Amino acid sequence: MAMTAAVKDELSRVDVPKPCCRRAEMAALLRFAGGLHIVSGRVVVEAELDTGAVARRLRREIAEVYGYPSEIHVLASGGLRKGSHFIVRVVKDGEFLARQTGLLDVRGRPVRGLPPHVVAANVCCAVSAWRGAFMAHGSLTEPGRSSAMEITCPGPESALALVGAARRIGIAAKNREVRGVDRVVVKDGDAIAALLTRIGAHASVLAWEERRVRREVRATANRLANFDDANLRRSARAAVAAAARVTRALEILADDAPHHLTSAGRLRLEHRQASLEELGALADPPLTKDAIAGRIRRLLALADKRARDLGIPDTEAAVTPDMLVV
């Protein structure tokens, strides 16, 4: 099950004992998923949802909290609609429900944001409003570079109200308009986990955190692998360049090089991928890595001096550009 569907399914089973919180959740759910229609002179309340469990929860809450009957209609997938959608519709008592849930104000005018009893309510109601908004039009992307918890809002007023509710919970959320659609977004991974926990998606937050940790471990492993590859490439280039310089040094000096320097140079050529420490251990008698490095350095310096005196290419000339590409 996708992350968003899993969260909505879990939230549809959250037990909310406080009446004020149940009203706040329903107000947000109807505001973010619903609409008001005039049918034959009557106000009809509708909410379109993409999860059957959420639709059943809304229908049950409308009956238990307000005592109004409602209908559920199923819209089969097709066209631009992915998957079935569920319409919860209140016809007979639509206007009463709209007034009681804050979709209409006392003068019968549509409320654009969230109703006052939610906006100015306690923190518990702010949490419930977020739960309702997410069940209505929320989405949760996989943990990663662009992970986000997002609510699609019916307008800028409801987006600002939801940002304010998040602030009361202690969560940083931002509203933005994308292609003419208002959205509220939580981007920080820790904030997403905290908000999921607050609204009651405990199993989902564990799954989300597990995927988040797994992705971070994988990213760290990839960075280390890239780092190791880069080090190997640098080491390979250095080994090729060192071998070319030593070969040129032995050509320049021929039999005039001191034996201990020549031996160090030949050891380098015989074991091109060995580290200085390994090279020193292979010497007879064994040498420290500083000692073997010093001998090779003196061999190259001696050869370069001879080359300058003779006016011929030195050891650096033996390192061609193609040797540095590995």
Swiss-Prot record:
GO terms for molecular function: DNA binding. It comes from the Bacteria. Keywords: Cell cycle, Cell division, DNA-binding. Residues 275-308 bind DNA. InterPro entries: Homing_endonucl, Sporu_reg_WhiA_N_dom, Sporulation_regulator_WhiA, Sporulation_regulator_WhiA_C, WhiA_LAGLIDADG_dom. Gene3D superfamilies: Homing endonucleases (3.10.28.10). One of its GO terms (biological process) is regulation of sporulation. Transmembrane segments: none annotated. Pfam families: HTH_WhiA, LAGLIDADG_WhiA, WhiA_N. Involved in cell division and chromosome segregation. Belongs to the WhiA family. This is Probable cell division protein WhiA. It comes from Salinispora tropica (strain ATCC BAA-916 / DSM 44818 / JCM 13857 / NBRC 105044 / CNB-440). The lineage of its organism: Bacteria, Bacillati, Actinomycetota, Actinomycetes, Micromonosporales.
